[in-house]
Amino acid sequence: MRAFFVGRFQPYHLGHHEVVKNVLQKVDELIIGIGSAQESHSLENPFTAGERVLMIDRAVDEIKRELGIDKKVYIIPLEDIYRNSLWVAHVCSMVPPFDVVYTNNPLVYRLFKEAGFKVMHTKMYNRNEYHGTEIRRKMLEGEDWEKYVPESVAEIIKEIDGIKRLRDISGRDF
């Protein structure tokens, strides 16, 4: 069975990590869709699609090693089309076929359900802590953000000078 899981992953954090780990134990293959792939260099979407692919790929490698599995994971950037009624068809045209969707996003749940897909809720993992908006705020404020993302993701953010980028685009003096 092949599953689909979508998010913006700005950045990929430990909440996403736990969902991916949980789903990988239930399915044969997983498609991870990177939503809003065209967005980058903004406060809400500071990282490029390519940077997010790298974050997710390295984090998934950690999961595979930890679980001792070698399942296929596709990581596919998906640009927004701004028409919800057509979004599921757009996704289906961009990714391999899948049997089930995992999401906690109410709109994603509804759109795939209406299109006839089996849709499963995922367990929420410390949603208040593992939330991209809050992690980006911590980055901006110089607070400890690294404990909320996998180690490999923190390394990538440092490699690309992601904190400086976020601070530069915020237009704030530090």
UniProtKB/Swiss-Prot annotation:
Family annotation (Gene3D superfamilies): HUPs (3.40.50.620)
> Which terms in the GO cellular component ontology are assigned?
cytoplasm
- UniProt-recorded name of the protein: Nicotinamide-nucleotide adenylyltransferase
- GO MF term (any one): nicotinamide-nucleotide adenylyltransferase activity
Q: In which pathway does it act?
A: Cofactor biosynthesis; NAD(+) biosynthesis; NAD(+) from nicotinamide D-ribonucleotide: step 1/1
- Identify the domain of life: Archaea
Gene Ontology BP terms? NAD biosynthetic process
